[in-house]
Every structure is written in C-alpha cells, then in structure tokens.
Amino acid sequence: MENSDVINFSCLEKELHSALQADRKYQRENDAKFRALNQKVASYEEFRDIVLASHLKPLDRNDISGSPRKQPWNPVACRTNYVCASSEQVQPQLSEVQPRSASEFIRDWRRFAGCSFEKYSLLVSLGGEALQKIFSTEIGLGLLGEFLLILSQCLKSGDEDRVTGVLDGLSKTGRFSINLSLLSQAEQEACEELFNKLKVAAGECHPYKDNSNTSVVCEAGLTHMEDNKTDITTTLKELAGKYGTEK
C-alpha cells in the first residue's frame, strides 16, 4: 500500500476535535447573544462582554462552601487595623472622584486602599442612585461584601438616611441576588449588624445622663422622627428582606 493510501487516524482525530470545539464555541456564543438580547443590554460593550464571557460557568455552592474565604486584598474582611484619615484630608480627594462606570469606580476604589473611611465616604457621597447606575449590569465579585463591611464599620451618626439610600441602590443592581448568595460569614454578620444599627437609629433615642439638655434634644429628635418613622421603618423592613436579614 502506498503512503498516500495510508489513513492518518491521529490527524483525523485532531481535525475532528477541532471541529467539535469550533461547533461548541459557535453554539455557546450564539446562545449568549440571544441571552444578551433578552436581557436588553444598554450598550454594545455589554453585549460583547456577555458573548466573550460565554465560556465561563457560575460557581456552585459546593465549590466555595468547603474552604474558608481568603481575601488578602480586602483589609476590612481580614480585620486589619489601620489609621483612617480625617474628613478634612479626604474631602478634596473625593471631590475629584466622579466615576460613571463600573471600571472607573473600581479604579478609584483601589486608590483608596489605605483607609476604609475614605471608601465609606466615597459610597455615601455617590449615593444609592449613582451606584445603581454604575453597577446596572452587576457588582464586581467581592465588592458587595466589602461595601457591607465598610458601611457597618464606619457608619456615622447622621448618615443613616444616606446609608439606607446606598443599600437601596445596591439592592437594585444587576445580579444582586447572586452577589448576595456569595457573601462570606463575616460579611453576612456585618450586614446584620449594619441593619441593626440603622433600625436602632430610626426607632430609639439614647440620652446622656450628664447632659442637662438631654430631654429637650430627645423630645425634638423624636418629634422629627415621628413624621418619617413609618416611611423609614417600612424602607428598612423591605431592604432587610432583600438582604436576608429580616427575622
């Protein structure tokens, strides 16, 4: 038998394997295109990103439940102690930060790696509506948990309404339920602690025994709160349900 008549099975196997891979890729990307159209993405960039990421598979709970979560890039989750800058030092920097997309936000977020107070101030200054627009597609992996840790750790008196607005905006972002299901134990506890703080601030007044004007201040505060108490309580209850902290 001549060499030209010999069948090269190895070569045929490689060609068949390549053809199968190309067919799978076509089917996968085609399905991703229809999925992107059904989601009514806002831009071609989002459409392209969904198609390019079509080969990625979502994590199963079994993939993450067996081992502790390690986030060396997240000093708050690791309970790292460091000195926060004062508001006077932070404010000039925050005035220059106006991210309009998720990529711009992440870039600016990483610049504030030295102090959680700076990140807290950034979240509060942007507000829930802006954050909802920035993360309309989804919040980056790990960011939601970091947001909750920072908001719980750095919550300041007087910021309760604005923080509630931030939580409301984040709850309306894309794939929120998926990001919520990926929270670590520490992040879930921080979320519960944050809602407890907000509920206490909305419904209680804590007087100082040595302050002679305490009763007047508390009475004025309670009078002001009575007008908005129902709305605030309802909003917090709805948000607690979305974040899974409602008992």
Swiss-Prot record:
Conditions for induction: Expression is regulated by foxj1.
Keyword entries, A-Z: Cell projection, Cilium, Cilium biogenesis/degradation, Coiled coil, Cytoplasm, Flagellum
Transmembrane domains' residue ranges: none
Stretches of the chain forming a coiled coil according to its record: 12-32
Effect of disrupting the coding gene: Defects in dnaaf19 are the cause of the schmalhans phenotype and show a curved body axis, randomized left-right asymmetry and pronephric kidney cysts, which are characteristic features of ciliopathies. Cilia completely lack both inner dynein arms (IDAs) and outer dynein arms (ODAs) while cilia length in these mutants is not altered.
Main localization of the protein described in the UniProt heading: cytoplasm
An example Gene Ontology CC term for this record: outer dynein arm
Signal peptide, first to last residue: none
InterPro entries registered for this protein in UniProt: CC103 (IPR042422), Dynein_attach_N (IPR031733), RPAP3-like_C (IPR025986)
A single GO BP: inner dynein arm assembly
Disulfide bonds: none
Localization of this protein: Cytoplasm; Cell projection, Cilium, Flagellum
Tissues with expression: Expressed in all cells bearing motile cilia.
Function text: Dynein-attachment factor required for cilia motility.
Subunit structure: Homodimer.
Similarity annotation: Belongs to the DNAAF19/PR46b family.
Protein name (record): Dynein axonemal assembly factor 19
Species this chain originates from: Danio rerio
